[in-house]
Every structure is written in structure tokens, then in C-alpha cells.
Amino acid sequence: MGLTLTWLSIIILIPLAGLFLKTFELSFDQLWAIITSRRTLHALQVSFGLAFAAALVNLVMGTIIVWALVRYRFPGRRLFDAIVDVPFALPTAVAGVALTSLFAQNGWLGAPLAGLGVKVAFTPVGIFVAMIFIGIPFVVRTVQPVLLDLDVEIEEAAASLGASRWHTVFRVILPSLIPALLTGFALAFARAVGEYGSVIFIAGNLPNVSEIAPLLIVIRLSEFRYADATAIAVVMLVASFLVIFAVNRLQRFAQTRMPAH
């Protein structure tokens, strides 16, 4: 137990404590001016807003992908299952370059979308696409083992009792998946908020337009404004912690409700 706490302190707690201590170099007025500046607020809004939206999309699409992989047998299923892990293994810079090439105005998908008046690369839409790309495996790999362990006989029993397919999904299957879905959502959100490598290539990185908070931190560091960078990092840390804490509370609540179903 003591060794575990020691490693936890060295790896996580001490660096985070150092991050908070760095902000004490600023007065409250200076700290408030940094985190409420137009550029900082917009960067935080872009990062957290798009990360939340991307995590929601991944929650839905990831569940559909898991259902297809677990409940259906089709040619190429194993290959498709392996492809899901590509964002895990792919260097983020490579992912960013690939997405930018694909969605640029002369890219395979960017060209037809541009013809429809939709611009993806170098806009917040591109950030959204990149966050979906890097986040989808977290939902799939979190929910997949739970659905695999779910006994199909329970669904058959519900059907034999006259339950419709949708009633079975929402009253039998979904309640068992909710804790895993919430975990997948939290992981996808956390990854998207902190993503840097794949996003900066497709974002455009224009201040007050498509600049993400991690990039703003790097810019402040390059300007030797370490306290400013630390202040933005602390805001991201606290906000991320609150979101993940809320999701974990919902997860525990869902687990306590599962026996009722």
C-alpha cells in the first residue's frame, strides 16, 4: 500500500502540485486577467466545447460499431475490429497530416465537400473531426467486453415474454451498458481535450477562431510566459477533473440502479 501511494505521488500528485504552485507567482488580478482574456476564453471554449460534442458523437457511433462487431458476423469483421485500434497506434502527427490531406480543399473528401460549400480543414469543423478520430477507440474498447459478456439468453427471455426489440434494448441491454458507456465517454472526452498533435495540423490555429487551449499553452511557453501557460493549464486541469468527476458519479449511480432492471 505504501509503495502504491509513493508511486502515485511521484507520477501524478507531485507534478500536479507543482503546476498549482506555479500559479502563486501571479496575483489574483493577474490570474483573473489571463484566464478571462478573450483569446484564452475562446481557446478553452473551442477545446472543451468540441471535445464534449466529439465525445457525444463517439458515444453513439462507438455503440453502433460495438453492436455490429459483437452481434453480427460479416466478411472482414476481424479486419474492421483491428482497424478500430489504428488511432491508438498511429502517431498523432501522422493522424493530423492524414486528416488534413483528406479534408483539404483538393483532398478526396475535402473537394466534394467544398463543392457543397462545406470547409473542414483549417476550421473548427476540422478540430471536431480530429477529436472524433482519436476518441472513437476509447468508447469501442470500453463497451465491447461488456456487451460480449452480456448473456443473449436474457434478450431471448425478454422477447419470449412479449417485449419488443426496442423495449429489450432500452430496458434490458442499455442499463447494463450505461457504466461502460459513461467510462468510454469520459475517456474520449479527456483524450480530446488534451489532444495536440493531430489537431494543430487541421485546425488552422487562428486566434479567436480555431486555436485550441493546448496550443495556446505552447505559444505562451515559447514566449517565456510560463506563469500564463501554467494558469491556462490549471484551468484545463480543474475543468477536466470536474467533468470526469461528474461522469464517475453518474457511473456509480447507474451501477446502483442496475439491479432494479
Segments from the language model and where they lie:
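The alpha-helix within a helix-turn-helix
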Residues: 158
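Transmembrane alpha-helical segments of integral membrane proteins
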Residues: 211-216
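Active-site/ligand-binding-proximal alpha/beta "capping" segment
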Residues: 152, 169
